[in-house]
Amino acid sequence: MSETAQSYDPTEDFQALVVTDSAAARVAQLIAQEESDDLKLRVFVSGGGCSGFQYGFTFDERIEEGDSVVEKDGVTFLVDPMSSQYLMGAEIDFVEGIEGEQFVIRNPNATTTCGCGSSFSI
């Protein structure tokens, strides 16, 4: 069995965030509605929420120095260095169910989460 050497691109950190097909597809739809191909989805962690930290999402046109960059199906996801330490190995998904549709982050680093799913503690 032969292995192909892969080049390392320091702007890409695939362990910072795992993105599902459904999450990438939904973000692509949202970007199309905004009519700006330069948009990227920034996923971040901030202080707050009932468990101490909360997840946030915003569109951004710029990749900042130190950002982890994850590409999935033509969509770019960004994570800043501070948030990256909390999101390492986390998965972002988009689910549709009886409760409606929403982005869900499954974070192996979170020790507790609140009922709303957008707040956690480590």
From Swiss-Prot:
Keywords: Iron, Iron-sulfur, Metal-binding. It comes from Alkalilimnicola ehrlichii (strain ATCC BAA-1101 / DSM 17681 / MLHE-1). Disulfide bonds: none annotated. It holds the Pfam family Fe-S_biosyn. The gene is erpA. Homodimer. This is Iron-sulfur cluster insertion protein ErpA. Its cofactor is iron-sulfur cluster. PANTHER family: IRON-SULFUR CLUSTER ASSEMBLY 2 HOMOLOG, MITOCHONDRIAL. SUPFAM superfamilies: HesB-like domain. Binds 1 iron-sulfur cluster per subunit. InterPro entries: FeS_biogenesis, FeS_cluster_insertion, FeS_cluster_insertion_CS, FeS_cluster_insertion_RrpA, HesB-like_dom_sf. GO terms for biological process: iron-sulfur cluster assembly. Required for insertion of 4Fe-4S clusters for at least IspG.
